[in-house]
Amino acid sequence: MDLQLITTEMVVEAYGDTTDGISVFKGNRRVGYITGLKKDLAKQVKRKTTIKEYRNRRLEQARDMLPDAVEEMKVFLENQLAKYDCEVFINQTQPNVHINSCKCYIIVNPLTGKHRLGISNPNRSASDMAEDVEACFKISKSPAEHHILINGLSQDDIVEVIKTLCM
C-alpha cells in the first residue's frame, strides 16, 4: 500500500487510541511516531496481500489438478488392490475403497503428494488400528470408536496401511 494513501486515522485505528499529530498513544503510553507506524502498516498490508495472492494461486492450482489426481489415485488403487475382493470408486470427489467390511476414504492432495486416509473398521477399535500403523505417520483423533484418520501418506503407504488394517 502506498504510504501517501495511509491516513493518520488509519494508523491510530491500527496501533492506538489517540494522536497528538506526531505520535500515536495507547492509553497514556506512546506507541510510536506516525511516520514509522505508517511504514509498518504499509509493510503489514503488503505482506498480507502477498500471502493472500500466493494462497489463492495455490488453491486455484490445486483445484485444477484435483480431478486428474483423484482419477490417478483411483487407477493406482484398482491396480494395487486388484487381487483382493474390494470395490474402488469415486464418492463425490474423492476415491473410496470398500474391502472386508472396511470403508476407506482417501483425501487426495495433488500439490504435495501427501494424502489422508480414513478407515472405518467395524471389527477393530481405533486404538487397535493405531497400534498397527507405523509410528512415523501422524494419526488424528476421531470421536468414532472404530475410525482412524492418518495424515501424510504416499500412494504406496496408503495401500500398505489398507492391507494392514483391513485384511
From Swiss-Prot:
BP terms from Gene Ontology? symbiont-mediated suppression of host gene expression; symbiont-mediated suppression of host transcription
Could you tell me the keywords of this UniProt record?
Bacterial host gene expression shutoff by virus, Bacterial host transcription shutoff by virus, DNA-binding, Host gene expression shutoff by virus, Host-virus interaction
Name of a matching Pfam family: ALC
Q: Which InterPro entries match?
A: Host_transcript_inhib_Alc
The yes or no answer to whether the keyword Ion transport is present is no
Superkingdom field = Viruses
Q: GO molecular function: any one?
A: DNA binding
Question: What does it do?
Answer: Participates in the host transcription shutoff by causing premature termination of transcription from host DNA. Acts as a site-specific termination factor that abolishes transcript elongation on cytosine-containing DNA but not on the 5-hydroxymethyl cytosine present in the viral DNA. Therefore inhibits as well transcription from other phages that contain cytosine in their DNA.
This protein's name: Protein alc
- Its source organism is Enterobacteria phage T4
